[in-house]
Amino acid sequence: MSESNQATFQGNDPAAHAPDAAAYDKGKGKAVEDMDVSMDEEEEESEESDAEIMVEDEDDDGDSNLEPVSTENIISGGRRTRGKTIDYQEAANKIDADEMDDEEDDDEDFKPSDK
């Protein structure tokens, strides 16, 4: 039989006996992950710096003055308009009227072309 039909074993690797042994590194094969030590160090440094930043943020909270909220500052009755009474129905009608005016303006801009 020819050598091309044989199973590939470590001892029977045709690429290892080839004149160009560098060809063994090319093409498909088992992927070997190279560990890059410098990347690991950078990750550790970034984790440490994140932890330091979080500690600094916690220190900032300690400087603020957290006094209890006075009940005199709380608005009762849901009033958020500084005493002005708003008629919501009137406001809705005004918005509808404005939309109608816009539609009429659009009709005036359109001029049919005569062919």
From Swiss-Prot:
Keywords: Chaperone, Nucleus. Residues 1-115 are annotated as: Disordered. It is found in: Nucleus. Residues 23-33 have a biased composition (Basic and acidic residues). InterPro entries: Histone_chaperone_domain_CHZ. It comes from the Eukaryota. Residues 34-64, 98-109 have a biased composition (Acidic residues). One of its GO terms (cellular component) is nucleus. Residues 13-22 have a biased composition (Low complexity). It holds the Pfam family CHZ. Residues 1-11 have a biased composition (Polar residues). Forms a heterotrimer with H2A.Z-H2B, stabilizing the association of the histone dimer. Also, with a lower affinity, forms a heterotrimer with H2A-H2B. Belongs to the CHZ1 family. Forms a chaperone-bound H2A.Z-H2B complex that acts as a source for SWR1 complex-dependent H2A to H2A.Z histone replacement in chromatin. This is Histone H2A.Z-specific chaperone chz1. The lineage of its organism: Eukaryota, Fungi, Dikarya, Ascomycota, Pezizomycotina.
